[in-house]
Amino acid sequence: MSSADWMAWIGRTEQVEDDICLAQAIAAAATLEPPSGAPTADSPLPPLWHWFYFLPRAPQSQLSSDGHPQRGGFIPPIPYPRRMFAGARIRFHHPLRIGQPARREGVIRNITQKSGRSGPLAFVTVGYQIYQHEMLCIEEEQDIVYREPGAPVPAPTPVELPPVHDAITRTVVPDPRLLFRFSALTFNAHRIHYDRPYAQHEEGYPGLVVHGPLVAVLLMELARHHTSRPIVGFSFRSQAPLFDLAPFRLLARPNGDRIDLEAQGPDGATALSATVELGG
């Protein structure tokens, strides 16, 4: 299938219904350990926790060798084998209520092809709207990048990170238990997150890869527990992978009506940057 054929997927839609069940929210709280503790029935779902719902549940026989569902259907069958959730832009209009049903409507908004250091790249922009009782609660755009295999990724060289005086910080130890639990929360069978020999020998990573959405959620958790204002928007961009080889640092810098967020690898480089927008 040529890139021209992929364009036929623009405008394709899907609709998924799910219960914002309490058990899944409790499992998320057990994994993330928010200071506020586990949520209760009919309480508002914390921001970004909607990523733990509306999950693709491909049958086992329809998984690719890397653990991803085979492409086609809603997502175009782009042949490049490497996939990355590269970024997102989200508006929070109303909180989802735990214990109540919801509906997510998706649409393929754009597909573009570019060239990078590893060869051709395909960018797929997916739009989502989440409704509960016919009220629009969340709007989201996700950027998914597909690429050819590249050169092996070297392990970052740890350095002593300088102290930061203008930010709230947290150090995260990304051990395999955390990565496994997050994969379970998101029903994500991609082997780079739990199968070390596969991650190293098949995809060329130095260790298990930390999920980009996990880093984004951890940054959101840091931000939301250091503000009393409502969170109305969030955006993030992945810049470099993180691995389970060493701790990484989260930083949150309040800046007027927003909070600037950053995840730094053990080498001090920015792995993911994000922004929280605050309401009145």
Curated annotation (Swiss-Prot):
Domain of life: Bacteria
Enzyme class: lyase
Ways its activity is controlled: Inhibited by 3-methylfumaryl-CoA concentrations above 0.3 mM.
One example GO MF annotation: (3R)-hydroxyacyl-[acyl-carrier-protein] dehydratase activity
Keywords recorded for this protein, A-Z: Carbon dioxide fixation, Lyase
Function, as annotated: Involved in the glyoxylate assimilation cycle used to regenerate acetyl-CoA and produce pyruvate as universal precursor for biosynthesis. Catalyzes the hydration of 3-methylfumaryl-CoA (mesaconyl-C4-CoA) to (3S)-citramalyl-CoA.
Family: Belongs to the HTD2 family.
Protein name per the record: Mesaconyl-C(4)-CoA hydratase
Organism this protein belongs to: Chloroflexus aurantiacus (strain ATCC 29366 / DSM 635 / J-10-fl)
Lineage: Bacteria, Bacillati, Chloroflexota, Chloroflexia, Chloroflexales
Gene responsible for this protein: meh
